[in-house]
Amino acid sequence: MKISSVFPWQQAVWQLLVQSRARQTMPHAFIFSGLSGVGKLHFTHAVSAWLLCQQPTALGACGQCKSCQLWQAESHPDYRFLQAMTDEKTGKTSRIIKVDQVRELVGFLNKSAQLNGYRVAVIQPADILNINAANSLLKTLEEPGANTAIILLTDQPLALLPTI
């Protein structure tokens, strides 16, 4: 994936994240919500690359380190992107993210990072987690491992379970 910069209307949130990381008070979970097409996924990619980068700056990921090279090759071992599955036979995409998918993601998040940095998991759209899947995620959201970032993307934040 290309390492991208953030859009101008995302600068205020970006600066909050930069300050949090500098103070070592980075939250472990984020909900990025907004209308479809405003750049949530673009912003999420920038944040993910920056968190995984071994030499991050206030402007973003360096683009040069091993972690950035793996990011650009779309093969970073400490990054997972979770979305509804597509049936191989029918080609139809499920309307929900299933509990088995979340359990696999939680297993990934409970392991140590392979590059000794962050582990980043993105769930898009988080509002299609079924109840069992959302409940499977709760303990990890409440008590994540060190250097873990979970990013939930949604166009419909009110559709998320209240506990999330």
Regions of interest found by a model, annotated:
Residues 57-60, 148, 152, 160:
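Short, surface-exposed helix-loop/turn micro-motifs enriched in polar/charged residues
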